[in-house]
Amino acid sequence: MIQKETNLVVADNSGAKKVRCIHVFGGTGRRYAALGDQIMVSVKAAVPGGVVKKKDVCKAVVVRCVKEQKRKDGSYIRFDENAVVLLNAQGEPRGTRIFGPVARELRDKRYMKIVSLAPEVL
């Protein structure tokens, strides 16, 4: 579960390394984001010469979450870290590579570009 003020790792090569959630999309009363949900993030650490800089605000999608999530077949999926992929205004990834595995729930939420770039889909 991702909520406001949650620190996350960036799983792409957009230039950001660490970000913080500042808003969860999906209504005024929505508190938590899970796998495949969009959030608004603020960049807290970035590499020099990257596409995004520190203090930038951008949209992101959650690709890995520590809190386990139940699937329709009854199994659970969870990861060791909270990770996001940064998105542009059209909803496509800002980076050209994805690092680490991503959840299969992204395919259900129509993030095909992220699924195709990922080295592993769990």
Swiss-Prot record:
SUPFAM superfamilies: Ribosomal protein L14. SMART domains: Ribosomal_L14. GO terms for cellular component: cytosolic large ribosomal subunit. It comes from the Bacteria. GO terms for molecular function: large ribosomal subunit rRNA binding; structural constituent of ribosome. Keywords: Ribonucleoprotein, Ribosomal protein, RNA-binding, rRNA-binding. One of its GO terms (biological process) is translation. InterPro entries: Ribosomal_uL14, Ribosomal_uL14_bac-type, Ribosomal_uL14_CS, Ribosomal_uL14_sf. Pfam families: Ribosomal_L14 (PF00238). Gene3D superfamilies: Ribosomal protein L14. Part of the 50S ribosomal subunit. Forms a cluster with proteins L3 and L19. In the 70S ribosome, L14 and L19 interact and together make contacts with the 16S rRNA in bridges B5 and B8. Binds to 23S rRNA. Forms part of two intersubunit bridges in the 70S ribosome. Belongs to the universal ribosomal protein uL14 family. This is Large ribosomal subunit protein uL14.
